[in-house]
């Protein structure tokens, strides 16, 4: 697989909630950087992703791979779904929010995913006002200290 195909396969697994398979595509020192209190490792990212899917069973990431530049694959994401389960983000210091049945849809953000030796080492979600996890929390009425 080329880098673009590797990222597309990974993003497809995340979209389907196939987190065990997605995990197998991440290096042990994988890091996610985005609109969260601090960068997180593979284990914490997987827990957060599983918890997001549990809180939003219809979660759609609207992933789109848009290009490559060396080891970096550029993509976009635009989250939407309905909050029908508990959103437990205690593993990233954001507490737990009971189901609200509120539908959310956030703005598109750009991401950069680094691939080395057919494995994903880094996922950077560039901050955009009204996008990502911060925007979801705002739409749910959750007060946080996160910057958008």
Question: Residue ranges of each PLM-predicted region?
Answer:
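C-terminal and inter-domain tail/linker signature
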Residues: 1-148
């Amino acid at each position: 697989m080329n880098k673009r195909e590797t990222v597309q396969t990974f993003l497809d697994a995340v979209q389907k909630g196939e987190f065990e398979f997605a995990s197998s595509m991440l290096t042990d020192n994988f890091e996610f950087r985005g609109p969260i209190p601090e960068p997180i490792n593979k284990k914490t990212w997987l827990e957060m992703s599983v918890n997001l899917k549990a809180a939003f069973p219809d979660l759609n990431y609207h992933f789109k791979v848009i290009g490559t530049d060396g080891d970096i694959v550029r993509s976009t994401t635009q989250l939407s779904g309905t909050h029908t389960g508990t959103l437990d983000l205690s593993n990233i210091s954001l507490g737990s929010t009971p189901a609200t049945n509120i539908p959310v849809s956030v703005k598109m953000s750009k991401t950069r995913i680094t691939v080395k030796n057919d494995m994903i080492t880094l996922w950077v979600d560039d901050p955009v006002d009204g996008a990502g996890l911060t925007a979801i929390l705002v739409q749910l009425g959750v007060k946080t200290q996160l910057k958008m």
